[in-house]
Amino acid sequence: MGIKITMADKWFSLSIREAYDWTCCRCGTKYHHNHQGLDCSHGYSRGNWATRFSTLNARPACMGCHRIESGHWMERLLTDWERERLRELRDDVQLAKMYRKTKGKGELSKHWKQQYDLCLQARECGVTGVLPLEEWL
């Protein structure tokens, strides 16, 4: 059985894809809003709750690039400091327990829905490029 997709996963994924203007981070293909051909690629598996909702750990990737590159985009797109920070988060057992306790609901889900709504508002106002996202913690 695969990893269950929670409401927080849904809103986080939409936030990442909207923040990057529905553009694949590898090949640069731009997709229409809500297109199912663009995934939210996680550098470290969504099974790790400490990094599951980290913006450092996620980039949009089309299905083909996601399959080819998997999480290897981290080496290409993140700085040494960002990769080290992500490793620290990955190994933080207490953080993972705290995130897991939410079960991807409540405040966590609400936060990522708000981030998605803020991205949509920015796009409606004509803001282009990559949009900043605020981490939950």
Please identify what each model-predicted range represents.
Residues 8-39, 62:
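Short cysteine-rich loop/turn motifs with clustered Cys
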Residues 2-6, 13, 48-51:
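Short, surface-exposed loop/turn motifs that are enriched in glycine and acidic residues
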Residues 22-25, 48-69:
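Short beta-strand-alpha-helix junction that forms the catalytic/metal-binding core
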Residues 36-45, 72-80:
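Short cysteine/histidine-rich zinc-coordinating motifs and their immediately flanking basic loops
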Residues 30-34, 46, 68:
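Cys/His-rich metal-chelating microdomains
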Residues 1-9, 134-137:
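Arg/Lys-rich, low-complexity, intrinsically disordered N-terminal tails that contact nucleic acids
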Residues 55, 68-137:
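A detector for short metal-coordination/catalytic motifs
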